[in-house]
């Protein structure tokens, strides 16, 4: 194997690691892995969302219907793109930095909601 072939192979093997390191989520997002993100509406009903380290998420709607999609980090916001049921676009919100207090946000209709992180995989 020539020196240039070895260097090319090393670069190809290292590239995915560099991309993964560059896109590592912040600590407040990592804290959601294995736990439940609640989006609480003014009427008290909530959606449950579970972020996974691989960039996907699953959840339950206010009515208990299955939700799923992909998530990404853009600046200080977490963006959810929903594929089940399919919705166009994505919703980006500031993610709670203090799980016990949560953060106020706006839903797509402009209604004020509260985002809160709850320990464990809460389903009810």
Regions picked out by a protein language model, each given a short descriptive name:
Residues 1-8:
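Bacterial N-terminal signal peptides that target proteins for export
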Residues 6, 17-124:
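Lipid interaction determinants
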Residues 12-13:
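Hydrophobic alpha-helical transmembrane segments of integral membrane proteins
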């Amino acid at each position: 194997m020539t020196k240039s072939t070895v260097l090319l192979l090393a670069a190809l093997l290292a590239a995915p690691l560099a991309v993964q390191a560059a896109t590592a989520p912040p600590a407040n997002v990592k804290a959601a892995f294995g736990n439940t993100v609640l989006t609480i509406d003014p009427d008290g009903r909530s959606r449950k969302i579970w972020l996974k380290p691989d960039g996907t998420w699953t959840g339950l709607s206010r009515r208990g219907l299955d939700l799923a999609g992909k998530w990404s980090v853009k600046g200080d916001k977490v963006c959810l793109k929903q594929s089940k049921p399919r919705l166009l676009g994505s919703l980006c919100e500031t993610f709670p930095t203090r799980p016990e207090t949560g953060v106020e946000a706006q839903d797509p209709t402009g209604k004020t909601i509260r985002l809160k992180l709850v320990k464990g995989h809460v389903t009810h």
